[in-house]
Structures are given as C-alpha cells and as structure tokens.
C-alpha cells in the first residue's frame, strides 16, 4: 500500500535550499575578504617605501658624526638599507603567517558547520536525493583535494595555534631576493646611462689671466681624465705645459679645489654647490653673483680654472687664488659670495 511522503520531500527541498544559500553566502564573504585584503595591500605600498627610506635617512644622520669619506658614507648607507630591509621582511613575514592562521581557522569552522548540517539532513534527503548525493560527494572530494594541495603548498601541517613568525620562509625570501636584484640592476643600468651621456665643459687655463677652451666629456669621467684631455689641447699653445703631467695640474670650480678622483657625475646627481656657484653645471653664463640675488639657487655657473700647482703655490696669497680652498663634500654653502 502506497504511503504519503509529501512532508518529508518538502523538508528535504527546504534543507537543500538552505545549504545552497549558505554556500552562496560563504562565497560572497570570501570575495569581500579578498577585495579588502587587496585594497589594504595596495594602500600600504607607498607608505611602506616612504617609511623605509625615511627611517634609513634618519638612522644615517644619527650615526654619522664629523667628517666621513664618500666611500665610508656609501658603505654605511648600504649597510643601513640592508638592515632595514631585513627588519621589514621579518614584519611582513609575521603578518602573512597571521593571515594564513586566520584563514585556516575560518575553514575549520566552515567544515564543522557543514558536518552538522549533513548529519541533521541526512535522513530527510535520503529518499529523493540519490543523484544529488553523488554530485555533492564528487564536489566534496574535489574540495578536499584542493585543500590538500593548498595545505601542501603552504606547509601548514603543524599546530595552527603555535606562533611560527620567527621561522624563515624560503619561498618568500627567494622572491624578495629576486625582486631586490631586479631593482638593483635597473638602478645600476639607469646610472650607467647617465654616466655615458656627453657634456661640453668650458674651462679656462689660468696663469694670471684666463684662456678659455671647451672640451667634450662624459658625465662619468673623472677630473683626472678631464685634465688629461685639457692638457693635450693646451700644450700646443703654452710652452710651460709641454713637460707638465696631469698630477701637476689643479681644477678649480666655483672657488673650490676639486680632487682628481671625483667625477662630473658625483656633482650632477648630488646638485653640489660651491662658494660662488653650482658645481653641477659646466657651461658658462654671466656672473650670477652680480646679476641678481646671490642667495637664490641658480643653474648658471662660471668656467672652471685649470691651473699649474706651481703657479698656485706662488700666488695663493693673491686674489683670486686667496679665495680657493679644498672641496669638502660635508660643507654646505648656503650663499654664493664674491669675497
């Protein structure tokens, strides 16, 4: 004799709809969480880089006292940058591990809820959902396979309640090293391109009066290379230079005696200034100290002087040689002066 099964079938359909709605709600929550995480990561990029370089600059200023050579300054700056990057890497590693633990706990809660729903609705769905059970079983197996693969990739086979922020993450370290190397190579390529650019240098051979010449150099050339080329140009016109070598010449720029090992690039990238004008321009304009307010930074500069060291020793008590002094990268010139 046939039996009426209407109530059981209606209850099964209702439970099936509830499960579908629960799954849709979980998917929406996951999408919202991913979008929020992406927005937070994007908004923190600029802050992270600016805070990183501000901290390095502050540490460099506080740890540098007195006169320091250019090489020592560069070495100290590189060491501070590396130390700061290690600190940031540790903080980022701790944050990522915390997020992974939160996601793992959330998955455990969802799986527990699914098990409770399945145990309650099993008897009601048994009569009419034979085909649906097979489909759900297949979906459940796929989900378990995905979770197993994800667990293997993330290496989260340990107790999620244990703090593992101090442990190294080889994958992330390799990615950070790769990115750091790419940025270093990109920066070096850009600097090499700048150094290879050609500039025209206007200079004056000074023996009590000026004799102007021009020569083309590259921004990466040193003062010694420049003086060698200038000497080749001047020898045919000045007999006292025919037996002179580069080590006997001095280069005076904006009343500062420039050491031979410095390059034009050093002054260009740092926008260095001298006593009477900028050191980063090597073409010539009228005297910037007489045209307008000499305290305002200008691009105009004076022709650098090429001088025999013997001439300087004899005349260093007489103007203009009396104004000349050795270049010191730590000394700042706030105003341009004539005397």
From Swiss-Prot:
Effect of residue 255 to G: In MRXSA; hypomorphic variant; does not fully rescue craniofacial patterning defects in zebrafish morphant embryos; does not affect localization to the nucleus
Keywords, comma-separated and alphabetical: Acetylation, Disease variant, Intellectual disability, Isopeptide bond, mRNA processing, mRNA splicing, Nucleus, Ubl conjugation
Any GO BP annotation: mRNA processing
Cross-link (Glycyl lysine isopeptide (Lys-Gly) (interchain with G-Cter in SUMO2)): 100
Example of a GO cellular component annotation carried by this entry: nucleoplasm
Region (Disordered): 1-31, 121-177
Chain span(s) of sequence motif Nuclear localization signal: 152-155
Residues making up the signal peptide according to the UniProt record: none
Pfam family, one: XAP5
UniProt-annotated location(s): Nucleus
Biased composition regions of type Basic and acidic residues, renumbered to the chain: 168-177
Expressed in which tissues: Widely expressed in fetal and adult tissues. Mostly abundant in fetal brain, liver and kidney; in the adult, high levels were also observed in heart, skeletal muscle, spleen, thymus, prostate and small intestine. Expressed in fetal cerebellum and hypothalamus. Low expression is observed in fetal temporal lobe.
Chain positions with N-acetylalanine modification: 2
InterPro entries listed in its UniProt record: FAM50A/XAP5_C, XAP5
Composition skew (Acidic residues), residue ranges: 124-146
Domain of life according to the entry: Eukaryota
Example GO molecular function: RNA binding
Subunit relationships: Interacts with EFTUD2, a component of the spliceosome U5 complex. Interacts with DDX41, a component of the spliceosome C complex.
Its job: Probably involved in the regulation of pre-mRNA splicing.
Family of the protein in this entry: Belongs to the FAM50 family.
Associated clinical condition: Intellectual developmental disorder, X-linked, syndromic, Armfield type: An X-linked recessive disorder characterized by global developmental delay with impaired intellectual development, walking difficulties and poor or absent speech. Affected individuals display a distinctive phenotype characterized by postnatal growth retardation, variable head circumference with a prominent forehead and dysmorphic facial features, ocular abnormalities, and seizures.
This protein's name: Protein FAM50A
Organism field: Homo sapiens (Human)
Lineage: Eukaryota, Metazoa, Chordata, Craniata, Vertebrata
């Amino acid at each position: 004799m046939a039996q009426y099964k209407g109530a059981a079938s209606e209850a099964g359909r209702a439970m099936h709809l509830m499960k579908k709605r629960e799954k849709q709600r979980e998917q929406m929550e996951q999408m919202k969480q991913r979008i929020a995480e992406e927005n937070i990561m994007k908004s923190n990029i600029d802050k992270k880089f600016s805070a990183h370089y501000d901290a390095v600059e502050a540490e460099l200023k506080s740890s540098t006292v007195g006169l320091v050579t250019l090489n020592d300054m560069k070495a100290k700056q590189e060491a501070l940058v590396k130390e700061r990057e290690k600190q940031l890497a540790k903080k980022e590693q701790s944050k990522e591990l915390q997020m992974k633990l939160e996601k793992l706990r959330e998955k455990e809660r969802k799986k527990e809820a699914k098990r409770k729903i399945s145990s309650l609705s099993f008897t009601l769905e048994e009569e009419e959902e034979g085909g649906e059970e097979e489909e759900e079983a297949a979906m459940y197996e796929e989900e378990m396979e995905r979770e197993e693969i994800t667990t293997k990739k993330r290496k989260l086979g340990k107790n999620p309640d244990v703090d593992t922020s101090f442990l190294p993450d080889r994958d992330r370290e390799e990615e950070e090293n790769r990115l750091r190397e790419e940025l270093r190579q990109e920066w070096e390529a850009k600097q090499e391109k700048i150094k290879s650019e050609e500039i025209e240098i206007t200079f004056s051979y000074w023996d009590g009066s000026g004799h102007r010449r021009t020569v083309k150099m590259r921004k990466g050339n040193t003062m010694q290379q420049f003086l060698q080329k200038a000497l080749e140009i001047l020898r045919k016109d000045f007999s006292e230079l025919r037996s002179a070598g580069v080590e006997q010449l001095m280069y005076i720029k904006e009343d500062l005696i420039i050491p031979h090992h410095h390059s034009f690039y050093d002054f260009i990238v740092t926008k260095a200034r001298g006593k009477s004008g900028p050191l980063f321009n090597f073409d010539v304009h009228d005297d910037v100290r007489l045209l307008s307010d000499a305290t305002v930074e200008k691009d105009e500069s004076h022709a650098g002087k090429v001088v025999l060291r013997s001439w300087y020793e004899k005349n260093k008590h007489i103007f203009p040689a009396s104004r000349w002094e050795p270049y010191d990268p730590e000394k700042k010139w706030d105003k341009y002066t004539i005397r």
